[in-house]
């Protein structure tokens, strides 16, 4: 279902989250063309390193202002750095300290973009907010569903799975019905300053710097041994927090005698002994899981799923939908997959779908081996 037609938009005031990127720029433009009263809001979510080569906030604000000036709308600014630190960044650090690999973008959406920003926009008198996310919404039977974006290469429902239906109901997603090339074409046609601006990648507060350089500013590293699955010590790591399951690059253990030429991969992060367990080969059996246990489940809508139930799931962004059976456990949920899943990583999110509907998801706690003979210590 497309967002309301012009006849439904009379006098509705929408505040668009302007990131300084092309997607939010085109979102604001499209809403104006649909007859909404549109204003923009630029969020500042990070205070550290302002003015350095890593922080693009000033450039992004300038781009957002240029677009707003071009299309003739007001741009508000708001500082949510304190909320971001308390609700996103401290959790990010705690997860890494615990040896897990978190996804701060998911928390940022739930706590900042669809909570702090939404509340602030309502305080400014908005009827609705809008963002440049590649997702869609559908109102049905008194609830609002979150749907995948039409562009399978840009669909961002994975990152919005923890946002509630009540928040989705107050949000418009103008580019969710479009593919990325169409969005850029619209921006170029209207000569928007962001038309050719590259998409942002990675974690926003880290920017282009090395991840390890950033993390060691906040957490003390604990070096330890790198071992094979047979227990042989073949190197040392600088800290388990710098590594993730399935990682190949940056291990520094090449050229070992009688080891063969296959690359090494991270298989296990042994927190108890502060050891990194590695093995050779992209298809090493310890990399594959049959099932996972998840906690901290957020459903977009609190509906009865009549578990166990056949669904599809993603254990990482841009993964194709993986058929699975979801069931309730004592402490959370268990998803059992039809096919082996590679590098299922504790701390990351598993997101569940029923066709094009994003139902919700949770945090991966445990990855179970594909077969008993592949059981890990």
From Swiss-Prot:
Superkingdom of the source species: Bacteria
Compartment list: Cytoplasm
Residues with site note (Interaction with tRNA): 133, 348
Main location: cytoplasm
Region feature Interaction with tRNA, mapped onto this chain: 154-156, 316-317
Active site positions: 108, 204
Binding residues for ATP: 17-24, 43, 132
Covalent S-S links between cysteines: 108-204
Region annotation Interaction with target base in tRNA: where it falls in the sequence: 103-105
Keywords: ATP-binding, Cytoplasm, Disulfide bond, Nucleotide-binding, RNA-binding, Transferase, tRNA processing, tRNA-binding
InterPro entries for the chain: MnmA-like (IPR004506), MnmA-like_C (IPR046885), MnmA-like_central (IPR046884), MnmA-like_central_sf (IPR023382), Rossmann-like_a/b/a_fold (IPR014729)
Gene Ontology BP term (one): tRNA wobble position uridine thiolation
The reaction(s) this protein catalyses: S-sulfanyl-L-cysteinyl-[protein] + uridine(34) in tRNA + AH2 + ATP = 2-thiouridine(34) in tRNA + L-cysteinyl-[protein] + A + AMP + diphosphate + H(+)
EC number per UniProt: 2.8.1.13
UniProt-listed Pfam families: tRNA_Me_trans (PF03054), tRNA_Me_trans_C (PF20258), tRNA_Me_trans_M (PF20259)
GO cellular component terms attached to this protein's record: cytoplasm
GO molecular function: ATP binding; tRNA binding; tRNA-uridine 2-sulfurtransferase activity
PANTHER family: MITOCHONDRIAL TRNA-SPECIFIC 2-THIOURIDYLASE 1, TRNA 5-METHYLAMINOMETHYL-2-THIOURIDYLATE -METHYLTRANSFERASE
NCBIfam families listed in its UniProt record: PRK00143.1, trmU
Protein name (record): tRNA-specific 2-thiouridylase MnmA
Originating species: Pseudomonas fluorescens (strain ATCC BAA-477 / NRRL B-23932 / Pf-5)
Origin organism lineage: Bacteria, Pseudomonadati, Pseudomonadota, Gammaproteobacteria, Pseudomonadales
Gene: mnmA
């Amino acid at each position: 279902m497309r967002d309301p037609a012009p006849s439904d938009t009379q006098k509705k005031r929408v505040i668009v989250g302007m990131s300084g990127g092309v997607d939010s720029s085109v979102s604001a433009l499209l809403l104006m063309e649909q007859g909404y009263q549109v204003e923009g809001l630029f969020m500042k979510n990070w205070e550290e390193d302002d003015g350095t080569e890593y922080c693009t906030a000033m450039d992004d604000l300038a781009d957002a202002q240029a677009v707003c000036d071009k299309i003739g709308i007001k741009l508000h600014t708001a500082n949510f750095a304190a909320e971001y630190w308390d609700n996103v960044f401290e959790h990010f650090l705690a997860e890494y300290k615990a040896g897990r690999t978190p996804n701060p973008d998911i928390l940022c959406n739930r706590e900042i973009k669809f909570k702090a920003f939404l509340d602030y926009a309502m305080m400014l008198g908005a009827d609705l907010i809008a963002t440049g996310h590649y997702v869609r919404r559908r109102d049905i039977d008194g609830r609002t569903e979150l749907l995948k974006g039409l562009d399978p290469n840009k669909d961002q429902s994975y990152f919005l799975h923890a946002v509630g239906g009540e928040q989705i109901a107050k949000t418009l997603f103008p580019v969710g019905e479009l593919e990325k090339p169409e969005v850029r074409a619209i921006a170029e046609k209207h000569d928007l300053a962001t038309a050719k601006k590259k998409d942002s990648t990675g974690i926003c507060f880290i920017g282009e710097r090395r991840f390890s350089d950033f993390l060691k500013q906040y957490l003390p590293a604990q070096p330890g041994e790198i071992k094979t699955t047979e227990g042989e010590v073949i190197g040392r790591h600088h800290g388990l927090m710098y590594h993730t399951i399935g990682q190949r690059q940056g291990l520094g253990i090449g050229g070992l005698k009688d080891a063969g030429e296959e690359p090494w991969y991270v298989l296990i992060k042994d927190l108890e002994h502060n050891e990194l367990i590695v093995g050779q080969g992209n298809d090493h059996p310890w990399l594959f899981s049959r099932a996972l246990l998840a906690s901290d489940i957020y459903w977009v809508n609190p509906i009865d799923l009549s578990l166990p139930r056949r669904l599809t799931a993603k254990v990482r962004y841009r993964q194709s939908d993986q058929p699975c059976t979801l069931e309730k456990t004592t402490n959370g949920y268990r998803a059992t997959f039809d096919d082996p899943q590679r590098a299922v990583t504790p701390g990351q999110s598993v997101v569940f779908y029923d066709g094009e509907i994003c139902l919700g998801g949770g945090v991966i706690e445990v990855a179970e081996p594909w077969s008993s003979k592949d059981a890990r210590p």
